């Protein structure tokens, strides 16, 4: 719903809010902190989505759809890359397929924008999008998050999804993913965790991914080293920045 400082996109759009902690990559999720802040400010959409645990905001597991937000992309006349649901997961089990279909309709009717949808639940993405009534949209990039080798199976699920562009976000990268199969994955984003309690990202893990991308023809985007002060840590790798974007496949 707003312009964003996220390096690989231009704006965020949140027709859904709230989520459930799923795997290790969720532990320090920035969206939990942001949702708690918005809840404290009295923003109705975020009421009841987080709770305090050990002094930190955690998801309650409650998910809210926001039909009013469906009109937002049409108001944007300037074409932009749009990160869909930076504050949730469109393919959370509690998001009705009918609502996902409404989101799809909005994307189809605003082809000037490029939509980037990221999920930790690619198995549901595949199940919903292969029902036969979700067209493959050339302006919809579909991706999954992979934080370590324990969840590499998400890439196999993503490959089942019919998509113009498939991508993987390896952020927060908290372990090696050496040996990952990037076949038919068009774009890889790599980033270290940032903020309180950020876990260290080993440079070797990043270089492994960059080499895998070269072998598979996958565009490589290095987002950040992360840490408590991500700006100070920067986003250069081996003396340069990597801002590659995928080429359209259909």
Give, region by region, the residue ranges found by the protein language model.
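Auxiliary Fe-S-binding modules of radical SAM enzymes
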Residues: 1-21, 38-42, 160-163, 174, ...
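N-terminal [4Fe-4S]-dependent radical SAM core
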Residues: 1-81, 89
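General N-terminal targeting signals
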Residues: 25, 30, 43-46, 99-101, ...
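Small/flexible residues
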Residues: 35, 39, 53-54, 58, ...
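Solvent-exposed, non-transmembrane amphipathic alpha-helical segments
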Residues: 39, 46-49, 104, 127, ...
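Short alpha-helical interface elements
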Residues: 44, 50-55, 128, 132, ...
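Conserved AdoMet/S-adenosylmethionine-binding subsite of the radical SAM
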Residues: 64-219
């Amino acid at each position: 719903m707003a312009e964003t400082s996220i390096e690989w996109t231009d704006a965020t759009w949140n027709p859904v809010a709230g989520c459930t902690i799923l795997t290790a990559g969720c532990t320090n999720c920035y969206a939990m902190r942001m949702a708690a802040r918005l809840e404290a400010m009295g923003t109705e959409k975020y009421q009841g989505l987080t709770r305090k645990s050990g002094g930190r905001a955690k998801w309650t597991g409650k998910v809210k759809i926001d039909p009013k937000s469906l009109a937002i992309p049409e108001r944007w006349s300037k074409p932009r890359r749009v990160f869909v649901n930076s504050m949730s997961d469109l393919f959370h089990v509690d998001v009705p397929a009918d609502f996902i279909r409404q989101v799809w309709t909005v994307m189809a009717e605003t082809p000037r924008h490029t939509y980037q949808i990221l999920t930790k639940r690619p198995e549901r993405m595949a199940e919903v999008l292969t029902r036969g009534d979700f067209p493959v949209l050339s302006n919809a990039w579909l991706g999954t998050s992979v934080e370590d080798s324990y969840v590499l199976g998400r890439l196999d699920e993503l490959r089942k999804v019919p998509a113009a562009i498939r991508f993987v976000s390896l952020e927060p990268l908290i372990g090696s993913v050496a040996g990952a199969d990037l076949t038919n994955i068009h774009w890889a984003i790599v980033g270290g965790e940032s903020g309180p309690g950020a876990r260290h990202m080993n440079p070797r893990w990043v270089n492994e991914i960059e080499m895998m991308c070269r072998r598979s023809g996958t565009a490589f985007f290095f987002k950040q080293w992360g840490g408590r002060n991500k700006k100070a840590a920067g986003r250069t790798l081996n003396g340069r920045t990597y801002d590659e974007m995928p080429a359209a496949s259909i």
